[in-house]
Amino acid sequence: MTDLRIAVLGVGVMGADHVARITSRISGARVAVVNDHLVEKAEQLAASIPGCSAVADPLDAIADADVDAVVLATPGGTHEEQLLACLDQRKPVMCEKPLTTDVSTSLEIARREADLGRPLIQVGFMRRFDDEYVRLKALLDGGELGNPLMMHCVHRNPGVPAYFDSSLIVKDSLVHEVDITRYLFGEEIASVQIIKPTSNPGAPNGVVDPQIAILRTVSGRHVDVELFVTTGVAYEVRTEVVGEHGSAIIGLDVGLIRKKGPGSWGGTLTPGFRERFGPAYDTEIQRWVDAVHSGTNVCGPTAWDGYAAAAVCAAGVESLETGLPVDVQLADEVTSPSPQGVRESDGCR
């Protein structure tokens, strides 16, 4: 099998991780082109990878005849143009979230893909590939807990970049719980409310942190999410589903060593997202590469999933301003060549 030739657009933290991942741990693929707005950085990275070149213009990188598929790790504001270019070139693309930065363009991207008659876009919600979430999904689908009634989530970060504002806690952090709610429960989210507890004195000036999100699904299930991104402690992600016949919780033991001693108890916590979800990223990219080789092109969250997440987060930002529940407005689901909707798009087997 000939290696898939991949262009990685954006070689910041996430993009550089993907370059290292594809180069060292993914089979059936190699990095052929890298691109970044910091041209010298891209050139230095390309020089360290056999057979790789740096291309200054992202659209030229997408159109390059030596590129079979694209990993998009550029800032969200550039995604619309770059995704449209991938569609025009009929090249499969793994797009890190967000699909785009607003609801209307996300919907337009999903519709444009559908018009082509073939799936090309996968969105990087990596939790669907995490072993614990996969097992929780299987447990729910198998009926062990009976009817799922509610879910409790914790999403904590030790800190965030200086540019982070209150709305990004919704759009950049809560978005993962939005997608995992749709994935686990197999239904859309009907409304969202953001509640503002007492703010952390350590949060940047003007940033509302922590926040509590209340999601209600179309069937009436409720999901509460604690979002606290300036804990100064560790990276913690936990999810507990409560059903009619019991409950199940994940995220307790990853990176945690519990210790007992004379009069003491303690352990260590996961320092960052790489340590917690590194294997999930590896699985995500490997399955995407395998899907492109097979011709299916998508093995996980679709453009519709990216659009639905954008719509929920837009309602969340509105609720952040008003404090009131806001209904989620979704367009009619597009007719797509890929398995759209939350029940069918949970990944390849």
UniProtKB/Swiss-Prot annotation:
Subunit composition and interactions: Homotetramer.
Pfam families cross-referenced by the UniProt entry: GFO_IDH_MocA (PF01408), GFO_IDH_MocA_C (PF02894)
Keywords, ordered alphabetically: NAD, Oxidoreductase
Summary of the function given for this chain in its UniProt record: Involved in the oxidation of myo-inositol (MI) to 2-keto-myo-inositol (2KMI or 2-inosose).
Lineage: Bacteria, Bacillati, Actinomycetota, Actinomycetes, Mycobacteriales
EC category: oxidoreductase
Highest taxon, organism lineage: Bacteria
Xref: HAMAP family: IolG
Family the UniProt entry places it in: Belongs to the Gfo/Idh/MocA family.
Entry EC number(s): 1.1.1.18
Coiled coil stretches, renumbered: none
InterPro entries membership: Gfo-Idh-MocA_inositol_DH (IPR050424), Gfo/Idh/MocA-like_OxRdtase_C (IPR004104), Gfo/Idh/MocA-like_OxRdtase_N (IPR000683), MI/DCI_dehydrogenase (IPR023794), NAD(P)-bd_dom_sf (IPR036291)
GO biological process, any: inositol catabolic process
SUPFAM superfamilies, per the entry: Glyceraldehyde-3-phosphate dehydrogenase-like, C-terminal domain, NAD(P)-binding Rossmann-fold domains
Molecular function terms from GO: inositol 2-dehydrogenase (NAD+) activity; nucleotide binding
Official protein name in the record: Inositol 2-dehydrogenase
Organism listed in the record: Mycolicibacterium gilvum (strain PYR-GCK)
Reactions this protein catalyses: myo-inositol + NAD(+) = scyllo-inosose + NADH + H(+)
